[in-house]
From Swiss-Prot:
Family annotation (PANTHER family): HISTIDINE BIOSYNTHESIS TRIFUNCTIONAL PROTEIN, HISTIDINOL DEHYDROGENASE HDH
E.C. no: 1.1.1.23
Protein name: Histidinol dehydrogenase
Reactions accelerated catalytically: L-histidinol + 2 NAD(+) + H2O = L-histidine + 2 NADH + 3 H(+)
GO biological process, one term: L-histidine biosynthetic process
Organism: Buchnera aphidicola subsp. Schlechtendalia chinensis
Keywords recorded for this protein, A-Z: Amino-acid biosynthesis, Histidine biosynthesis, Metal-binding, NAD, Oxidoreductase, Zinc
Length: 201
């Protein structure tokens, strides 16, 4: 049996019907979601890593022994991806780096008139967190587009979270971008951990 899509004639729809068509399920549940996210953030603040392991078990149905991805797994990721993917990542890396390098204007001093100077000081954010969603396809381009500017800016610590299990393509992009702090955590709990810190993050 074939599924036939409903044809909607917008001009013939009532205001209420249009509103219903345009509404998203997530928006209709926004208060419920907001309260759940607040609870998750509160638990991550209070219980740290324990909350992360618990939420990974509940939401991702995975019982992790370690939320941190080992350096060995990151380094060996190239063994588990195709030559075509490696080539595509290398080309994308060079292009993205070339573009963002032009944005790095740096600090400067400017004499605007006698005894009056203006200065621009550029300082990188010391520690940053990147979140890479997990879906039907690995979003390794997101790793490149977030990590390359952070590296160019001179951020000293770059952490990355992605829901478990993290795909080898993502780990390979982490390797190329020299990201060493990679964690198997997804959702609001990952954002809370990056923002508030835990024993591991």
């Amino acid at each position: 049996m074939h599924n036939i899509l409903e044809v909607i004639y917008w001009n013939k729809c009532s205001y209420e019907r249009k509103k219903k068509i345009l509404s998203r399920p997530i928006i209709s549940n926004r208060f419920l979601i907001r309260n759940k996210v607040k609870e998750i953030i509160s638990n991550v603040k209070s219980f740290g890593d324990r909350a992360l392991y618990n939420y990974t078990n509940v939401f991702d149905n995975i019982n992790l022994k370690n939320i941190r991805v080992s350096e060995e797994d990151i380094v060996s990721s190239h063994l588990h991806v195709s030559k075509e993917l490696k080539l595509a990542v290398e080309v994308a890396f060079k292009n993205i780096k070339k573009f963002h390098s032009k944005q790095n204007v740096g600090s400067f001093n400017l004499k605007v008139q006698d005894n009056i100077y203006c200065q621009q000081i550029i300082r990188p954010i010391e520690s940053i967190g990147l979140y890479i969603p997990n879906g039907s396809a690995p979003l390794l381009s997101t790793v490149l587009m977030l990590a390359i500017p952070a590296n160019i800016a001179g951020c000293k610590r770059i952490m990355l979270c992605s829901p478990p299990p993290i795909m080898n393509e993502i780990l390979y992009a982490c390797k190329i971008c020299e990201i060493k702090d990679v964690f198997q955590i997804g959702g609001a709990q990952a954002i809370a951990a990056l923002g508030c810190g835990t024993e591991t993050i």
